[in-house]
């Protein structure tokens, strides 16, 4: 139905090509019959407008990075589609028509303007490999969420980024991969919205976590940069270290690693080595390098919703000895995966 003051009525949206052909064939036959009987043509002023839809040929691949466009193409949701929406959408064309006094159809066409093309750094082959192994992990040991980033260390380009909660970009509101039909039917609008946003989230950018052992490389790097260690030092690991009234354990908590060099500490993921190094650094230098390495700061990646972890990082002013110790091996503070990468 059209508006009362409208000069035309939009009769139907999203007609199939078969429906269009059927109408054209039938209207042509009827108009020919009217002409044959010397009657004025009765079916006039009807035309069809092409509608373009964004199609994602790779389905769920890199879905949390790409995001999706709404059906009418007016807005992007999540990922690149949302971040670059204003560059991607372009302007829709329009075709207007009116009947002249002698019942001839006149048309006015306003051409469409294409949006810009965005090329990502995602390597499809690497992306599929990431997704394959995340799927295997989830099918085996499993976790609430699993994620991975593959970055070119020379340029910072993201070659792959995956979160285990994937969805089909061509059908982004389909929850059947995570909920039964009975569960979906029982959801109200709020519950459905929460389920959708949970499925669409990009853990690598939108969420924070305790990074754990990858932090150890940064602890060593800061100490070496300040000439506090040179890498030849050896530390004794007995499975724990008493700091600030706490026995803080190593991964080898029963017997420890024994005498362990800095390099061995990285190879064996020794917490005691890291705690000793951070104690040599002190809170001022350790906090300084946390900032230099970008922890607690947004990276500015061109994806929406990057989490702010500024309040989840210790400063030199509020860092106690036990905080320093646990931070040295990536616990007791949060960052995003993209910050860690």
Go through each PLM region and give its residues.
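Beta-lactam-recognizing serine transpeptidase/beta-lactamase-like catalytic domain environment
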Residues: 100-107, 122, 154-214, 218-341
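Long, charged, glycine-rich C-terminal linkers/tails
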Residues: 39-40, 47, 150, 301-304, ...
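Solvent-exposed, polar/charged alpha-helical surfaces in well-ordered, non-transmembrane soluble domains
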Residues: 13, 21, 25, 59, ...
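Carboxylate/His-rich catalytic cores and anion/metal-binding grooves
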Residues: 72-99, 145-174, 286
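Conserved, well-ordered alpha-helix/loop/beta-strand core segments that scaffold catalytic motifs
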Residues: 8, 103-146
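Small/polar-residue-rich segments within soluble enzyme cores
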Residues: 1-115
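Short N-terminal helix-loop-first-beta-strand/juxtamembrane motif that initiates sensory/input modules
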Residues: 43-47, 139-153
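Conserved short loop/turn motifs at secondary-structure junctions
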Residues: 7-12, 147-148, 274-280
